[in-house]
Amino acid sequence: MKDINLIEVEKLIGIEFENKGVLITALTHSSYANQFKDVKYNERLEFLGDSVLQLCVTKYLFNNYKDKSEGELTKIRALVVCENSLHKVSKNLSLGKYIRMSKGEELTGGRERTSIQADALEAVIAAVYLDKGIEVANDFILRNFKDVIDKAINEEIILDFKTRLQEVLQKNGEVNIVYNLVKHEGPPHRRKFFTDLLINNEIMGQGVGFSKKESEQNAAKAALQRLGEIKWEKDTI
């Protein structure tokens, strides 16, 4: 892949970086780093960005929705920061176009993959925080997540299928929900996870994803579809 056009990326996210290297790292997938020695990739930045995102969203919700209980705020935050929401924001910013990855990863659809785009966005958030500080990072997050926050507040989106399934089942009494990782296959940078969801020892949903979290969400989604709680779709989370 060609070098990242940093000028384009900075225009898209609305921030000019002092340290260009941290932005490049944020947009580098592990599969790319596996091909070249001494190339940093975005996994550690993703870890930091997740915490920065959680903090900024939590502070915003706490300050602006004083009528909401702790439980309600927790549920709203979960919707805002979940992988699917991150993917939507990442797509809006066209980050997928600029992620450095191996040719093999790209040929298997990596550029459009939910987990890769979501991870890259978290890494970019960390890069903004490290380069510009918490205030600029907070502004960046609120500017790009405002629509997601509004939809979560208005209950227009259900993104956390595991939580939704638990709520549906608890209405009918106590149930035993188990997510069983059946297998995983593929190389480390392109590994697929397969999960069975058991409700009272009966398989009610099966999910596949490029992370354990994604496969569990897809299994929960399949169970909700089977129970008639959401419509059947071809696309997974």
From Swiss-Prot:
Q: What class of enzyme is it?
A: hydrolase
> Where does this protein reside within or beyond the cell?
Cytoplasm
Top-rank taxon of the source lineage equals Bacteria
**Positions contributing to Mg(2+) binding:** E46, D119, E122
GO MF assignments: double-stranded RNA binding; metal ion binding; ribonuclease III activity; rRNA binding
Which cellular component terms (GO) are annotated to the entry? cytoplasm
Residues in the active site? D50, E122
Alphabetically sorted, this entry's keywords are: Cytoplasm, Endonuclease, Hydrolase, Magnesium, Metal-binding, mRNA processing, Nuclease, RNA-binding, rRNA processing, rRNA-binding, tRNA processing
GO terms for biological process, alphabetical = mRNA processing; regulation of gene expression; rRNA processing; tRNA processing
Q: Which SMART domains match?
A: DSRM, RIBOc
Task: Kindly report the protein's main subcellular placement as a broad class.
Answer: cytoplasm
Question: Where in this chain does the record put each RNase III domain?
Answer: 6-133
E.C. no: 3.1.26.3
The record's catalysed reaction(s) read: Endonucleolytic cleavage to 5'-phosphomonoester
Cofactor requirement: Mg(2+)
According to the entry, every stretch annotated as the DRBM domain falls at: 160-229
What family is reported? Belongs to the ribonuclease III family.
Quaternary structure and interacting proteins, as annotated: Homodimer.
Q: What does this protein do?
A: Digests double-stranded RNA. Involved in the processing of primary rRNA transcript to yield the immediate precursors to the large and small rRNAs (23S and 16S). Processes some mRNAs, and tRNAs when they are encoded in the rRNA operon. Processes pre-crRNA and tracrRNA of type II CRISPR loci if present in the organism.
Quote the PANTHER family the UniProt record gives: RIBONUCLEASE 3 (PTHR11207:SF0), RIBONUCLEASE III (PTHR11207)
Q: What is this protein called?
A: Ribonuclease 3
From which organism does this entry originate?
Clostridium perfringens (strain 13 / Type A)
- Tell me the classification of the organism that encodes this protein: Bacteria, Bacillati, Bacillota, Clostridia, Eubacteriales
